[in-house]
């Protein structure tokens, strides 16, 4: 039932978190469905007897990667050297982040007669929102005003910058900046909506002291008490699995701590 009335807008992910295998399964290039095709599916829902007017999700592996790609990658393929579209510190300069198509798509779905709500339940990359200086704020406002069912899913995974580097995730300051933007928009809208954080414990490079740091950060900066965290599980075909097995950073060949005993 969760996915019965949901819409997949695209496939692929160029986030390349070191622990994630989505890029291996679906590719590093975003394959975006046309707006017309997506709207046709949304209109079809309204003809179904069991449809109550609620689309449970409009998204993909990363909801806000819809509608834009690196022009260089689309014509020449992914970079062959060890270069990422999004790394732990910045976006590649040829990746022009643009949420405008996504914004218009969500507006068009809302305008369909018989559609009461269209939620975006898939996770979003908050670093893409903060990087889009032209449309990022507008996209988040659109989400806050119309497309969040009480909570928005984001995946910082950790808050220690050293651990985040090993994960291939953006630094904690990006999360702080995003949360400030999110809180501001919710206050302006008069809504009480929250952020749900995906967190990972015991990733290669993560020591007990880092988990204490995480607890302090979530309490004092995020103003919440995590109820759960996923214990790292090495997934075949990922850099994090290489780190787990070799106890080395595959990019620097430096020794890293790997929790295996407890």
PLM regions and their residue ranges:
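Conserved, mostly hydrophobic/aromatic
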Residues: 13, 38, 154, 229
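Iron-sulfur (Fe-S) cluster-binding segments and ferredoxin-like electron-carrier domains
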Residues: 20-37
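Eukaryotic scaffolding regions of large macromolecular assemblies
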Residues: 185-192, 214-215, 243-245
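N-terminal pre-triad scaffold of radical SAM enzymes
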Residues: 1-21, 39, 46, 52-57
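Structural recognition of alpha->loop->beta junctions
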Residues: 138-151, 215-236
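Conserved SAM/AdoMet-binding glycine-rich loop
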Residues: 44-196, 200-204
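C-terminal accessory regions of radical SAM enzymes
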Residues: 209, 223-226, 231-262
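Catalytic cores of alpha/beta
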Residues: 203-220
């Amino acid at each position: 039932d969760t996915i019965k009335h949901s819409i997949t807008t695209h496939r692929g992910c160029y986030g390349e978190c070191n622990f994630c295998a989505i890029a291996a399964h679906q590719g590093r290039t975003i394959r975006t469905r046309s707006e017309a095709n997506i709207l046709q599916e949304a209109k079809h829902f309204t003809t179904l007897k069991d449809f109550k007017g609620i689309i449970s999700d409009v998204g993909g592996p990363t909801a806000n990667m819809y509608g834009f790609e690196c022009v260089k990658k689309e014509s020449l393929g992914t970079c062959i050297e060890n270069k990422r579209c999004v790394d732990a510190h910045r976006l590649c300069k040829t990746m022009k982040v643009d949420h405008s198509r996504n914004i218009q798509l969500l507006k068009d779905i809302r305008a369909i007669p018989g559609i009461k709500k269209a939620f975006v339940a898939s996770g979003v990359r908050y670093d893409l929102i903060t990087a889009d200086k032209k449309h990022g704020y507008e996209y988040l406002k659109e989400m806050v005003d119309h497309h969040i069912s009480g909570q928005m899913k984001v995946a910082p995974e950790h808050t220690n910058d050293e651990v985040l580097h090993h994960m291939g995730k953006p630094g904690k300051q990006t999360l702080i900046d995003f949360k400030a933007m999110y809180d501001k928009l919710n206050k302006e809208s008069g809504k009480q909506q929250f952020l749900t954080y995906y967190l990972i414990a015991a990733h290669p490079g993560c020591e007990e002291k880092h988990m204490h740091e995480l607890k302090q950060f979530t309490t004092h900066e995020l103003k919440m008490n995590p109820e759960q965290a996923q214990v790292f599980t090495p997934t075949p075909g990922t850099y994090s699995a290489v780190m787990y097995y070799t106890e080395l950073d595959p990019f620097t060949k430096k020794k890293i701590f790997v929790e295996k005993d407890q």
